[in-house]
Amino acid sequence: MSTDTAPAQTMHAGRLIARRLKASGIDTVFTLSGGHLFSIYDGCREEGIRLIDTRHEQTAAFAAEGWSKVTRVPGVAALTAGPGITNGMSAMAAAQQNQSPLVVLGGRAPALRWGMGSLQEIDHVPFVAPVARFAATAQSAENAGLLVDQALQAAVSAPSGVAFVDFPMDHAFSMSSDNGRPGALTELPAGPTPAGDALDRAAGLLSTAQRPVIMAGTNVWWGHAEAALLRLVEERHIPVLMNGMARGVVPADHRLAFSRARSKALGEADVALIVGVPMDFRLGFGGVFGSTTQLIVADRVEPAREHPRPVAAGLYGDLTATLSALAGSGGTDHQGWIEELATAETMARDLEKAELVDDRIPLHPMRVYAELAALLERDALVVIDAGDFGSYAGRMIDSYLPGCWLDSGPFGCLGSGPGYALAAKLARPQRQVVLLQGDGAFGFSGMEWDTLVRHNVAVVSVIGNNGIWGLEKHPMEALYGYSVVAELRPGTRYDEVVRALGGHGELVSVPAELRPALERAFASGLPAVVNVLTDPSVAYPRRSNLA
């Protein structure tokens, strides 16, 4: 009797792990060298998986998250035992809040010596599990591959997030077998369709609305629903605002895309469709909407907690199906409402014009972004790693394609930028990748410029160097009349640090120097920093409470 089943191949567990990654389309793993990971490294080498090493495990994990943000394929980081895992915890917590599909493979002390005091011995799962969708320890070489498959599936299943597996060293070096089964991501089930009565209520509200608005967020991107959202916006003629990775789903120059008119649009809307973004501090915990605004919430899963204000319709499930069901030509063209918002948008932009050409020394952040925006290509990938300097970027740098805006998300973890930028450029080598950093943020991961140089990753960074922790200094002075622990060394030469590491670096202290310096940075073909001295007296005009 014949059989078509291929015989299982015998291999060490490290190669089995790599083979299961490869079967799901994983071709890059971010890491920092660690002996507990040698068998996984060997497996990756045998399977043709690229290893990218960083100078801190935090950056390896942030880079893996950045990879997932750009590609929507789970990013993978391999972190060594003990301090390697604890160093990656901030990135894991951030990815979990961002719903970024991130798989972390951990080294671990040999199981046969647990409790005996091995180097870097600790049980990772109890402290990783609270910031992960899935956390497990391989109990043998035989189940290592199965756990990798389960981790990949957990990372992408809504709500997506972090999956963690650690591999005791003795198991990782032991022999196992692979039967060549399909990759874990080859057949993923579609999400559920929202209840019909909720869809009917939502469609009815949108059809009768006179001043509708859509507020779209990152889960539109994770839900692969960008085309459905654009169709809904255009067919129902609904103005849209976007944050996070939804920026660019509707191009910034589309007549229905708004940003400066945000307060008016959200505050005066009679119906608001909130898609893929929670009512957290970014939406004033629901307070940005008018007291009589009818709210429709659409997301991939129902939140664990109640919304902070009543919702007329909750639509939970596959976002493409949801938004497609809401699309159509029902209702009016809302032309009067759209014209009101367009007028508000134009007036707000007119008020900015003086700042865009401000010749002050040190520079105004708005002048910095006016010069940079003129050099950015339409598909540029923009990475934000800053406080106030990043907020100005959010205001000034427009997005024209989805998946082009990478910020730290609601966890607000500084130091994420170099990892995100590293991954973005590796994933999209032909596109501009621009990292916008504050001088405070540079201190978290400045040595990663060595990583960028070693791997020949030509990211261009603009540092807003105002010598302070601006997001803390200005509010503290307003509250107390003084500030403490809010100053940095003025004029620090971060550009010289980058040059010493092998990159391109320039200092800009006057406005006339900025455009030529940016042009040279883009033309250098090297990882580049333009270190711009900015005015420490300028505070971003916040309207919301971050807490």
UniProtKB/Swiss-Prot annotation:
Belongs to the TPP enzyme family. It catalyses: 2 pyruvate + H(+) = (2S)-2-acetolactate + CO2. Pathway: Amino-acid biosynthesis; L-isoleucine biosynthesis; L-isoleucine from 2-oxobutanoate: step 1/4; Amino-acid biosynthesis; L-valine biosynthesis; L-valine from pyruvate: step 1/4. Heterodimer of large catalytic subunit and small regulatory subunit. Thiamine diphosphate binds at E57. One of its GO terms (biological process) is branched-chain amino acid biosynthetic process. It comes from Mycobacterium tuberculosis (strain ATCC 25618 / H37Rv). FAD binds at residues 159, 299-318. It is an enzyme of class 2 (transferase). Its cofactor is Mg(2+); thiamine diphosphate. Induction: The expression is almost identical during the mid-exponential and extended stationary phase. CDD domains: TPP_BZL_OCoD_HPCL, TPP_PYR_POX_like. Its EC number is 2.2.1.6. Keywords: Acetylation, Amino-acid biosynthesis, Branched-chain amino acid biosynthesis, FAD, Flavoprotein, Magnesium, Metal-binding, Thiamine pyrophosphate, Transferase. Catalyzes the conversion of 2 pyruvate molecules into acetolactate in the first common step of the biosynthetic pathway of the branched-amino acids such as leucine, isoleucine, and valine. One of its GO terms (molecular function) is thiamine pyrophosphate binding. Residues 388-468 are annotated as: Thiamine pyrophosphate binding. The modification N-acetylserine is found at S2. This is Acetolactate synthase large subunit IlvG.
